[in-house]
Every structure is written in C-alpha cells, then in structure tokens.
A protein has these predicted regions:
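Short, Lys/Arg-enriched anionic-surface-contact patches
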Residues: 1-3
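Helix-turn-helix
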Residues: 6, 10, 14-56
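An amphipathic alpha-helix signature
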Residues: 8, 51, 90, 94, ...
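Residues in soluble alpha-helical coiled-coils and helical-bundle/repeat scaffolds
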Residues: 44-48, 52, 101-105, 118, ...
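Hydrophobic/aromatic residues within well-ordered alpha-helical segments
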Residues: 46, 53, 57, 61, ...
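Hydrophobic alpha-helical connector segments
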Residues: 52, 65-104
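Amphipathic alpha-helical packing segments from all-alpha helical-bundle domains
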Residues: 87, 101-111, 121-141
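Short alpha-helical scaffolding segments that buttress acidic/His motifs in well-ordered protein cores
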Residues: 96, 110-114
Length: 141
C-alpha cells in the first residue's frame, strides 16, 4: 500500500468514527506514521483529503455497479433486466447488498456519510443516492 493509500484508508477510518471536525490532520498523520508536513505532500488540505475520500469511494461504487452490469446513473438503460431469470436477479441483488454492508471500505464510507450528511450537503446527496435510491432501484428490477 502506498503512503497516499495509507493516508486515505486511515483518514476514512478516523473520519467515519470521529467525523470531519473530530479528526485532525495531526491525528491522521500520527496514525499513518508520518509527519503532518508529509501528509500535505499528498493532499494540500484536510478538506482536499476529505473530498478525495468521498470521490474515491463514489468511484469505487460506480466501478462495482458497472462491473456487475448494474445501472449506476438515472439515465442508464434498465431494459436489460426485463426477463432476467429470478435466480440470477436474486443473486445480483444479494451481491449488491453484501457489497453495501459487508465491504469494509463501503461500511466506513457509509458511516462517514451518515456523520457528515447534516453539515455537508454533498455527503447527504451521496448518502441518499447510494444507500437509499440505489437500494430501491435494485429492488425495482
């Protein structure tokens, strides 16, 4: 794991437990085992680090959906699922829910969004899109 990946992983863990305001750059750097100034070589600010985590996790969700053949955006074609065998559809839905709740990154990301949704409109919107709307969308097939 690269230093940047360690920073992202550690920051996600701290932000998901303590919230944005509760986790300091110093705490993150200390947990990674680097100097605070070294963290700034990878991310220019705490905000950039937080936004980088959110962007990365959304990209991972999109990769999962698209890699599984699931629609990700509202404009994606859902007609592909008409006439799909029930067993295949059930397996697809179960795999999707396991991803949402069992994947370690996703579980921490969900907690981060839950904590941040009241102060960060973008986090609220992403939480609704991924953990409410997507679940309903997958069930609607």
């Amino acid at each position: 794991m690269t230093t940047k990946e360690k920073i992202l992983d550690t920051a996600l863990e701290l932000f998901s437990r303590q919230g944005y305001d509760g986790a300091s750059v110093r705490d993150i750097a200390r947990a990674v085992g680097i100097r605070e100034s070294s963290l700034y070589n990878h991310f220019p600010s705490k905000r950039a680090l937080f936004d980088g985590i959110v962007d990365f996790c959304v990209q991972q969700a999109e990769l999962y959906f698209r890699g599984s053949g699931l629609p990700f955006d509202q404009g994606d074609d859902t007609s592909l699922y008409q006439g799909i065998p029930a067993e295949r559809l059930h397996a697809l839905i179960e795999r999707t829910f396991r991803y949402f709740f069992d994947d370690p990154w996703n579980a921490r990301f969900r907690r981060l969004l839950l904590l941040s949704q009241f102060t960060e409109p973008r986090c609220r919107d992403i939480y609704r899109q991924l953990y409410r709307d997507k679940c309903v969308q997958v069930q609607a097939f």
